[in-house]
């Protein structure tokens, strides 16, 4: 069920360019290149099909827009993402995020990122995140209990209700379901502003109070206020059940013992709110939507969860939910939270046999990798069995990157999978989902989100 893309890549190297020549220039007209760059979920596929798995764009004069290389092969992804963060810096999208939301693990440049990563890495190990999962199934059960038998529901809205509730109850010590608007609207406003400025070659100065800038700053202030309330409540109540907040308070850089300041903790909580709101909820919504179109797959998920009995699921049950995990991997393949990953080369580097100059903006097309017919059989089909152990054997680790890869991969991947697994198994054990929406429309203001309601009918399952 998995193909190996090395044959195509090596043939491309031999036929298209000598080793360490510059990547071939993309033949599409400038207008189509610009449109593809702004379409994170499908644009890299368009550029790959026209210019090959490593293709160079020129979107304007170098003094205005740096050269861009789009990479869509496993080898190219490895060559970019596995490098030391000293060689691969964050780019202007991350600079815009840092300016608006403050310095956090996602947007910090190398010098600030390294001590922060050292301090936070122990918090997010697979062992530790299991301590954060106590309320996930409980929240999912409560959401399902709200649905009348035969209810018509928007899977996107309900998935956000589950993930926000689980995030708040399990790790932040706060009922975020009562703060839905406090989180949802500011998050969407902030990420849209960041993505628009990051992708635009011509940007108004940050000091200019444009309407978009004012809205974005107000959104950032709202998120920081909420993060401050979460931190203050945890400090005021020693018994508050807020394991992530307590872990951030206790975090120390193992090399120098430095702890995080309250301002640094607030910035990390803001990015965690952003990631927890959009990314996991979209994965859960997509998985539910896909199961609503594949009755046999849905029945297998339900049978797996039912085999654990009628009790509430716990993090310890994830080991017995292997097929449910495979369903989520397939959802992440077809709808990755981050359709592209970007870096800036700080020195000349080799990318899949091509020489890329310092200062080049590098775009790794995750969606393009995940849907490449040279790498996957029937790439557009929803088939969780492709992630069974036998079918995963021999797969290039760099062709499936739902959480990125290398030293700057997503630090919260274990918690995201824990949350999505327990939520999906709990929901499907309790209801049958029948999807009414034929497609799952996606927009990518920054991460992938549903672009319209995802309607389905939820029928109760007899205990």
What are these model-predicted stretches?
Residues 3-13, 48, 140, 188, ...:
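Cytochrome P450 proximal C-terminal region
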Residues 31-55, 225, 229, 311-352:
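Conserved cytochrome P450 K-helix E-x-x-R motif and the immediately C-terminal K′/meander segment
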Residues 12-45, 49, 62-67, 74-79, ...:
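Cytochrome P450 catalytic-domain helical core, especially the substrate-recognition surface
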């Amino acid at each position: 069920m998995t193909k190996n893309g090395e044959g195509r890549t090596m043939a491309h190297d031999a036929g298209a360019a000598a080793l360490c020549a510059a990547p071939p220039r993309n033949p599409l007209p400038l207008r189509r290149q610009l449109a593809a760059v702004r379409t994170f979920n499908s644009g890299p596929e368009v550029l790959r099909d026209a210019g090959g798995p490593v293709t160079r764009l020129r979107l304007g004069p170098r003094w205005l827009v740096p050269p861009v290389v789009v990479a869509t092969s496993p080898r190219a992804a490895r060559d970019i993402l596995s490098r030391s963060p000293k060689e691969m810096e964050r780019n202007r999208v991350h600079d815009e995020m840092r300016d608006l939301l403050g310095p956090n693990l996602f947007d910090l440049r190398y010098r600030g990122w390294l001590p922060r990563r050292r301090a936070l890495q122990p918090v997010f190990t697979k062992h530790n995140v299991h301590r954060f999962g106590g309320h996930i199934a409980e929240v999912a059960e409560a959401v399902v209990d709200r649905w009348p038998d035969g209810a018509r529901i928007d899977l996107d809205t309900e998935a956000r209700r589950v993930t926000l509730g689980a995030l708040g109850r399990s790790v932040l010590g706060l009922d975020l379901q009562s703060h839905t608007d406090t989180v949802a609207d500011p998050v969407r406003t902030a990420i849209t502003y960041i993505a628009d400025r990051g992708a635009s070659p011509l940007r108004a100065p940050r000091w200019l109070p444009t309407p978009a800038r004012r809205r974005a700053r107000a959104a950032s202030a709202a998120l920081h206020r909420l993060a401050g309330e979460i931190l203050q409540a945890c400090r005021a109540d020693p018994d508050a059940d807020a394991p992530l907040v307590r872990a951030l308070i206790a975090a120390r850089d193992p090399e120098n013992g430095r702890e995080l300041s309250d301002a640094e903790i607030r910035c990390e909580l803001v990015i965690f709110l952003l990631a927890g709101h959009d990314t996991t909820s979209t994965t859960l919504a997509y998985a539910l939507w896909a199961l609503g179109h594949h009755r046999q797959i849905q029945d297998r998920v339900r049978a797996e969860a039912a085999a654990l009995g009628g009790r509430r699921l716990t993090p310890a049950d994830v080991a017995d939910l292997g097929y449910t995990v495979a369903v989520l991997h397939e959802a992440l393949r077809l709808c990755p939270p981050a359709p592209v990953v970007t870096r800036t080369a700080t020195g000349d580097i080799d990318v899949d046999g091509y020489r890329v100059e310092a200062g080049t903006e590098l775009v790794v097309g995750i969606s393009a990798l995940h849907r490449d017919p040279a790498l996957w059989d029937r790439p557009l089909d929803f088939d969780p069995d492709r992630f069974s152990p036998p079918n995963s054997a021999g797969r290039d680790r760099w062709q499936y990157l739902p959480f990125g890869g290398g030293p700057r991969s997503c630090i919260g991947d274990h918690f995201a999978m824990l949350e999505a697994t327990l939520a999906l198994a709990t929901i499907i054990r309790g209801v049958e989902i029948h999807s009414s929406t034929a497609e799952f429309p996606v927009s990518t203001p920054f991460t992938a989100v549903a672009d319209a309601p995802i309607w389905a009918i939820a029928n109760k399952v007899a205990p």
